[in-house]
Amino acid sequence: MSKPIRKAAVPALAAALLTACAGFAVFFVTLPSPEPFRHQNPATTALMDARAAEAKAHHRPVKRNWKWVPLSRISPWLQKAVVNSEDARFFEHDGIDIVETEAAISKAAEHHKLGRGASTISQQLAKNLWLGEERSLSRKVREAALARRLETLGKERILELYLNVAEWGDGIYGAEAASRYWFHKSAASLLPEEAALLTAMLPAPRPRNPKHPNGH
């Protein structure tokens, strides 16, 4: 490349870099802050709103069975089952589990299909709170960035939020509503086997029934 061409390329490259930096800055500045949820509970979530919009679009009644409870009123059996199943390194990572992500990428490359399993509890919470069911690369980037931000709330608060907004059936949200709907008892009273059945619903909460986990 001649000197005049190199000199002409420098301003163009600088402009491109500045544009990219500005784009990233706007991207991160416009991300929602988790700070309001440090001491306050959400009044709704993106997932709940998406489900409501879906119901209205199909002329069905909007269902929202939801009751908030503190983490201390959610069975330790359910807490442990969810962490072990959904995010075994929950208390070790900072929102993104690099080990699981690398394993998921390798598996996807092997089977030519992107599967579930790399999303941490923090990422799933970010998706439920703010992103809904959108599927795109930009959504995954936002999900990861929001998961890192959520980590500032602390692990116990993240787990409390997650267990209170997770979907556990058609219009059923949170551990308390799920426990009362499926087992007619409070979330605090769940037995180990009941906690395991609820945990098994999380990957596909609407089609699965904890009373008939095999579909029979």
For the regions a protein language model found, what residue spans apply to each?
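Juxtamembrane regions of bacterial inner-membrane/periplasmic proteins
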Residues: 2-216
